[in-house]
Structures are given as structure tokens and as C-alpha cells.
């Protein structure tokens, strides 16, 4: 335990250190700190999801299969920042720019990578036309082909904590394939006249998430940056389904069933067989002796 004069001498973001110190002064029990972190993480996320939900079942099964869900069990600092990122999305939807900026600056006091949230506002409100896909799709292909070279250049612009990272290959191709499927689904299925502004904004964020994911095979830093955007995807797909074109009605109903079944089965299979996912599985309660 450290005195107040030393709390900002740690090589950690000040918001997290201050929260840790305040909790230790009041409770002096690490379990209470975990409870508070869980509350700060879950309740803002729950509020934004509840506000934007269209199909809770589909949203839940997609969310728990996103890598962000697993990370939240161990990456406490970034879990708080991601939750605040959902609040930032809410402010972006309401065009409250000052509050949007302030909540992101606050999130950065818990994890510096939260600077990625600043992209939400312009991307969400961009009026993207389907004709633009003739440029976007080839650009995405080129980014994937030259992802290593592009990432090397981008790291020069990042804070030193990220720019000092050495390049390494990771197994992130499965998520790329999944995001490509989601992007195709979100552009093919809906009637553009029926898809509301929230749906179009979330679809823009999905495209940006795909672009970020293209760099994940090069280095896990890109995956860390994308955690902030993966949590928006579960909110998008039910809106796409609601706005489906008449000719895709049967396919949409089938996709609901497939998504619910596949992601439910996959989650339990992954939880049962996985051994290296940030030591989350198999899950043990704190009172268990393992």
C-alpha cells in the first residue's frame, strides 16, 4: 500500500491508480475493488445496450463470443475504458460533442488506448453510400495485403507504449472472416430506406472495426485497439434484420436461428476446450482452491 504522494508515480494510467487507492482506503479488501470495477464496467454498458437493443438474445450470444468479452475478465483497466466508450457512443448519437470528448479523456485515464474512441464521432455520422463500396472494398483488400508495412508506419504515430511494440504474427484470421461476413450481411440484407440512422452509424463503425482487424494478424496491439469497436457489432445486426428487404425475409429468419444456435454452441465448446484465453477458462471463483 502506498501513500497519497506516491499514487501518480506508478507506470499506470492515473485514473486506475486513483480508483485503486480510494478503494483501498475505504475497504482495504481487494475483493471490494473487483466489485467496484465490475460495477463501473457493467452498468454503463448495460445502460447503452438497453437503450439500443432490438433483439436481446442475438445481441447476447454475439457479445459473449467477441474477444472483448473474454478480455474483460482480466484486462480491468481497458474493460473500464471500453465501457466508457459505449457512453461515448451514446453522446455521439446525441451529437453532444463536448461530453463525447470529456468522457473519452476520462477513459484515457484508465487506458491510454482509449484515444481510439475519438474516431467514433466522425465515422458514426459519415453519410456512407453503397456506391462508395466500389472504392472501400478494393482499399480493404490492399490494406490486408500490405498490412505489415502499413502497421509499421502507423506505429510511428502511436504513443511510445505502442510504437515500441515489435511486429509478430497472431491468429486473428477467424475474426477477420467473421467481420467480413457481418459487413456483407449488413449491406446486402437491409432496405436502405428502412435502416435508421443508428443502424447506418453502427454499420460505419463495423466497417472501421474490420479495417482495424486487418492489422491484428500482424500484432496484437491492433486487436487491443479493436476491442473498443467490437462491442458495437451486437447492436447492429438486429437492426439490420428489422430493416430487411422483402426478398430476404426467409433468409433473415434463417439467419436468426443460425446465429443463435451457432454462437451458443460455439461459446460452450470454446469455454470447455480452451486453455489459453487470458486464463479465463476454465473459470474459477475466488473461494476455490486451484
Predicted features along the sequence, with ranges:
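Short acidic/glycine- and proline-prone juxtamembrane loop motifs at membrane-interface regions
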Residues: 73-79
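Transmembrane-helix signature of polytopic, membrane-embedded enzymes
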Residues: 46-66
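Transmembrane-embedded, aromatic-rich helix segments that form part
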Residues: 100-103, 113-124
Amino acid at each position: 500500500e502506498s501513500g497519497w504522494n506516491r499514487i501518480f508515480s506508478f507506470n499506470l494510467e492515473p485514473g486506475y491508480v486513483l480508483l485503486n487507492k480510494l478503494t483501498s482506503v475505504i475497504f482495504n479488501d481487494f475483493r471490494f475493488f473487483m466489485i467496484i470495477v465490475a460495477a463501473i464496467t457493467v452498468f454503463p454498458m448495460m445502460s447503452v445496450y438497453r437503450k439500443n437493443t432490438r433483439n436481446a438474445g442475438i445481441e447476447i450470444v454475439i457479445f459473449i463470443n467477441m474477444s472483448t468479452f473474454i478480455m474483460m475478465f482480466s484486462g480491468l483497466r481497458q474493460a473500464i475504458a471500453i465501457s466508457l466508450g459505449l457512453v461515448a457512443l451514446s453522446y455521439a448519437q446525441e451529437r453532444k460533442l463536448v461530453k463525447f470528448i470529456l468522457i473519452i479523456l476520462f477513459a484515457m485515464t484508465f487506458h491510454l488506448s482509449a484515444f481510439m474512441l475519438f474516431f467514433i464521432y466522425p465515422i458514426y455520422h459519415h453519410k456512407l453510400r453503397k456506391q462508395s463500396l466500389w472504392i472501400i472494398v478494393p482499399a480493404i483488400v490492399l490494406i490486408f495485403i500490405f498490412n505489415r508495412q502499413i502497421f509499421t508506419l502507423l506505429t510511428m504515430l502511436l504513443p511510445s507504449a505502442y510504437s515500441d511494440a515489435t511486429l509478430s504474427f497472431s491468429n486473428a484470421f477467424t475474426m477477420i472472416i467473421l467481420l467480413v461476413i457481418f459487413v456483407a450481411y449488413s449491406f446486402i440484407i437491409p432496405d436502405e430506406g428502412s435502416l435508421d440512422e443508428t443502424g447506418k452509424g453502427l454499420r460505419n463503425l463495423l466497417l472501421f472495426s474490420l479495417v482495424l482487424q486487418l492489422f491484428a494478424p500482424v500484432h496484437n496491439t491492433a486487436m487491443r485497439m479493436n476491442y473498443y469497436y467490437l462491442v458495437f457489432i451486437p447492436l447492429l445486426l438486429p437492426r439490420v434484420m428489422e430493416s430487411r428487404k422483402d426478398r430476404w425475409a426467409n433468409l433473415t429468419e434463417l439467419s436468426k436461428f443460425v446465429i443463435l444456435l451457432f454462437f451458443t454452441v460455439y461459446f460452450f465448446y470454446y469455454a470447455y476446450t480452451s486453455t489459453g484465453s487470458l486464463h479465463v477458462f476454465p473459470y474459477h471463483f475466488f473461494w476455490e482452491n486451484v
